[in-house]
Structure formats: structure tokens, C-alpha cells
């Protein structure tokens, strides 16, 4: 190996270790509905994004198997070559029915959706206004676009408006936000954002990755909690890999947006399409979430129970109001120790550190699901509080 490169890379790895930001891949040997096995230890899973417990649902498995038998294990090409199976158009129509939009486009992941769409829509002559805590895929899409990047303070619409006020009226403007923030569990003020986009002649993209399948009528997303808001969103992005228990993502909105992205989005054009079996599972998952209000209600109730008890115990959970509940610890070292101690007693909860979150705000991120029982959560809360006290995070 080239010695110059070896020295450089080894130095960077050692630096990560010293800063408490080194990451390892740990094998999950078996994952049940709410429990998993890691390092031969059975743990309550409070770390996954399987919010509605659908990843192991037999109906999705059977749908995937049926489509795999019919079409094969791989799409064999890009959608724009010969990889566009009939399932794509069928599922895209169901997304439009679900979201009340004109046209939809399925892509391979939430990351490629955001990077591809933002970098295709905007260029160096444009301005993009992005919440400071937006997902990395949004940030990377903005960087790739070359557009002027304006980051407004988290959920601070006054700050955003000041930026919009001084922006050149000659420039195209794009506002982009997560709807549920993945590391904080709080939500965007969509009505205010829509009002600002209309007032200043912008368009808006919302990332519903952690809200699709959960909020709004039929689980259509947080933007669908109030119908008039959904109709004013220009482009909705959502994923199938979280509440829907599958893989992949979608972009949907007015036809002209989707037509443009289909022709200009490099992360669609230059990649092999999703396997047919995945599309079969997606189709079934959408059917289920549109009808299964009980799972959504149970998830929301579980989130409220978990949040309330941790907050009452004295933990810093920020402004979480959803099923994602962080305990903000601060330093990397203390956060890693907290996570390790939780895993020792059988709770899978992972330390989240920079660059995923801002420096000084490292945390253990908990994610409850609809399938957790109150007994599960009560047991976990007792251990979390005990360890928190022993480690000095609680008085």
C-alpha cells in the first residue's frame, strides 16, 4: 500500500479513537419483533426504525416471495433501461392515491432521494434554506448542487424569514426540512414554513422519512395531519425502510417536478433499480398502513409513555414529541459508557455522536415501536433511571 496514504488514513483512524468517535460494525444475529440477539445476548430493541413492527410481518414476506418468484431476484438494470417492472407503476399510483399527488417516483433509498432530488433541482444560481438539524442526505444534496446554502436555526421561523427577506428576488429559492427530526424526535412547524414559502415565492421539499406510515390520514405523513398543508407542499419525500418495514424511498408531487427528476436525477439514472421482491413488499406495506390505525395509535401512546417517564425522572430529552426519544448526555465518553451499560443489562440503545449530532450533544437515541408492550417499556425505564443515577446523569 502507498505509504503516504497509509500514514494519512491511520492518523485519521487514531484521531477518531481519541475523540470517542470511532465506530464498529456489530452483528445482529437475530431480530424478533421487539427483541434482538447481539454478542449472544438477548436485548430489548430500542434502537431500530421498525416503528410499526412490519419488517418481520408474514404478509410482507409472502408478498416479497411471490414477486421474486415471478420476476427474479434482481431488476438487472436501471429503471430507464429495462429495470422498470410493472410493479413500479402500480406502487407509484398507490403512492399518489395515498398522498393525494399527481405523480410519484420510487428510488433506492432516502439518502439517494434527497441527494439526487436536491442536486438535480438546484444549481449555483439558486438559494436553498435548510434547517440546521436536517438529515445529512439533505446537506449533501445541497453541497452537490452548488447552490447558496442558508442554514436557519433549528425550527426558528423568524430566523428563516430574516434570511428570506434579504435574499435576492432574482434568485430561485428552495426550503427543505425534515418533518420529524431523526435524532431529536421533534417536529417541523409545517404551517409556518408553507406560509413563508408562499410569501417569498419559494418551493418546499419535506422529508417524511420518520413520519411516513405514522402520522396523518392513513399514515400519509406529518404534512397530512392538516390536509391544506399537504396540498401546498411541492415535493414530498418519504422512505419505505422505517415504519413500512421494507426498503427504498419515494418522491411525489406535481407532475412537472417528477417528470424533471426522472430525466435529471443522477441517483436514479445511474443505479440499478430495486429488486422486484422489495417492490412487492412495499405494495403490501402501503396497503397495511393505510388501514391499520391501531398500530399507529399504539405507537403514539408508547412514545408518550416512554417520553413522559424519562422526562419526569429528570433526563434531558430535548423537545421530543414523537416515538424518537433521545437522552442528551453531552460528551462522547459518557454517552458511550451509558450505552454500554444499557446493553449489559439487555437494552439495545446506541450512542449517537458527532458528526451525526452537534459537538457537545452526544446522546443515546431510543426509538419505541407499536409492538413494545407497556411491560417492556416499564422494565427498560427502570434500568435507564437506575443506570442514569449510578453514572451521575441524574441527581
Swiss-Prot record:
Metabolic or biological pathway, per its Swiss-Prot or TrEMBL entry: Cofactor biosynthesis; biotin biosynthesis
Amino acids binding pyridoxal 5'-phosphate: 110-111, 182, 207-210, 239-242
Record Gene3D superfamilies: Aspartate Aminotransferase, domain 1, Type I PLP-dependent aspartate aminotransferase-like (Major domain)
Keyword Signal in record: no
Modified residues annotated as N6-(pyridoxal phosphate)lysine in this record: 242
Cofactor: pyridoxal 5'-phosphate
Sites where the protein binds substrate: 23, 135, 356
InterPro entries referenced in this protein's UniProt entry, alphabetically: Aminotrans_II_pyridoxalP_BS (IPR001917), Aminotransferase_I/II_large (IPR004839), AON_synthase_class-II (IPR050087), AONS_Archaea/Proteobacteria (IPR004723), PyrdxlP-dep_Trfase (IPR015424), PyrdxlP-dep_Trfase_major (IPR015421), PyrdxlP-dep_Trfase_small (IPR015422)
Keywords associated with the record: Biotin biosynthesis, Pyridoxal phosphate, Transferase
Subunit-structure text: Homodimer.
Family named by the database record: Belongs to the class-II pyridoxal-phosphate-dependent aminotransferase family. BioF subfamily.
This protein's name: Putative 8-amino-7-oxononanoate synthase
Gene name in the database record: bioF
Amino acid at each position: 500500500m502507498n505509504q503516504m496514504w497509509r500514514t494519512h488514513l491511520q492518523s485519521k483512524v487514531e484521531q477518531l479513537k481519541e475523540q470517542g468517535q470511532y465506530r464498529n460494525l456489530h452483528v445482529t444475529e437475530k431480530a424478533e419483533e421487539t427483541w434482538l440477539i447481539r454478542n449472544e445476548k438477548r436485548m430489548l430493541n430500542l434502537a431500530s426504525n421498525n416503528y410499526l413492527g412490519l419488517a418481520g410481518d408474514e404478509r410482507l414476506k409472502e408478498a416479497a416471495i411471490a414477486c421474486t418468484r415471478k420476476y427474479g431476484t434482481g431488476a438487472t438494470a436501471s429503471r430507464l433501461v429495462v429495470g422498470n417492472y410493472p410493479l413500479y407503476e402500480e406502487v407509484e399510483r398507490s403512492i399518489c392515491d395515498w398522498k393525494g399527488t399527481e405523480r410519484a417516483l420510487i428510488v433506492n433509498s432516502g439518502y439517494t432521494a434527497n441527494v439526487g432530488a436536491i442536486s438535480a433541482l438546484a444549481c449555483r444560481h439558486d438559494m436553498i434554506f435548510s434547517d440546521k438539524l436536517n438529515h445529512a442526505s439533505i446537506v449533501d444534496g445541497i453541497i452537490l448542487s452548488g447552490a447558496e446554502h442558508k442554514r436557519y436555526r433549528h425550527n426558528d421561523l423568524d430566523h428563516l424569514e430574516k434570511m428570506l427577506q434579504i435574499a435576492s428576488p432574482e434568485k430561485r429559492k428552495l426550503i427543505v426540512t425534515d418533518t420529524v427530526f431523526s435524532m431529536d424526535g421533534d417536529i417541523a412547524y409545517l404551517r409556518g414554513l408553507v406560509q413563508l414559502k408562499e410569501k417569498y415565492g419559494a418551493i418546499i421539499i419535506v422529508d417524511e422519512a420518520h413520519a411516513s406510515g405514522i402520522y396523518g390520514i392513513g399514515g400519509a405523513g406529518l404534512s397530512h395531519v392538516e390536509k391544506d398543508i399537504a396540498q401546498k407542499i411541492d415535493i414530498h419525500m418519504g422512505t419505505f425502510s422505517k415504519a413500512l418495514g421494507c426498503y427504498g424511498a419515494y418522491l411525489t408531487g406535481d407532475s412537472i417536478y417528477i417528470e424533471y427528476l426522472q430525466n435529471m436525477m443522477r441517483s436514479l439514472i445511474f443505479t440499478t433499480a430495486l429488486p422486484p421482491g422489495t417492490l412487492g413488499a412495499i405494495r403490501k406495506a402501503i396497503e397495511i398502513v393505510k388501514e391499520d390505525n391501531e398500530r399507529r395509535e399504539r405507537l403514539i401512546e408508547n412514545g408518550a409513555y416512554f417520553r413522559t417517564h424519562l422526562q419526569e425522572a429528570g433526563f434531558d430529552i430535548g423537545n421530543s414529541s414523537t416515538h424518537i426519544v433521545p437522552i442528551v448526555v453531552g460528551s462522547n465518553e459518557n454517552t458511550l459508557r451509558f450505552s454500554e451499560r444499557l446493553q449489559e443489562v439487555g437494552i439495545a440503545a446506541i450512542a449517537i455522536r458527532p458528526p451525526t449530532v452537534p459537538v457537545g450533544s452526544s446522546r443515546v437515541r431510543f426509538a419505541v415501536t407499536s409492538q413494545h408492550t407497556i411491560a417492556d417499556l416499564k422494565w427498560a425505564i427502570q434500568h435507564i433511571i437506575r443506570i442514569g443515577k449510578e453514572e451521575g446523569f441524574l441527581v
